[in-house]
Amino acid sequence: MLKLQNYSDNILKNIHLEFNKKQNFIILGSNGAGKSTLAKILCGITPSDIQIENQNLSSYNSKERTKLINYVPAKLEIFDEYLTLNEYLDLSKLHTLLESENMLKLFEIERLRNKPCQQLSSGEQQLTMLASAILHNAKITIFDEPTANLDPQKSRNIFSLLKSKLFQNKIIITHDLNLAYKLQYDILYMKEGEIVFFDSSSKFFTESNLNDFFGLSVKRLDNDIMVNL
């Protein structure tokens, strides 16, 4: 479904990646590992020879690309200071008014519908982007640190959404080991611009790998929690 071969730049080194239909995976790594750089290549923000459905992404027109892949950044960038939350959700024009209303209720942001996006808190902006991503319904959705600005309760709610079938295929960028461990999706682990592991969650979260990648700073306490010591 998605393929990137032998890509290198000033940050990434010899990246080879294939992503199949109905596969969800997590791009995991510390800050500065190259996670967001790779994500911008995968969604076409940074030019490359990436292929989706056996065709170069650049060969699709904008409408086709919109249906194929969607990038949800860690921070909402709005250049129109008067654009309201409702207007932001309507930008894609790929959904009905009822669907938009349902998203406002799902994320409990109905009261904010007429508030300019620039005046929303960072957590409210995060929820707005996630609501928009569900409405967008692209074949592949890339989430960049989806729980970064949320309190613990909202983070748990977003975790449930990421585990749900509301999205067709998911790529989730995070440095949060706990989130990655609980989601149990395939793990692509990056270090210093290189992919050093890409396989199942069960194979990644072994005592041997944890020692190799993190030394004594990480330990598995039970079946649900990973901690940084």
Regions found by a protein language model. Name each.
Residues Q51-E64:
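ABC ATPase NBD Q-loop/coupling interface
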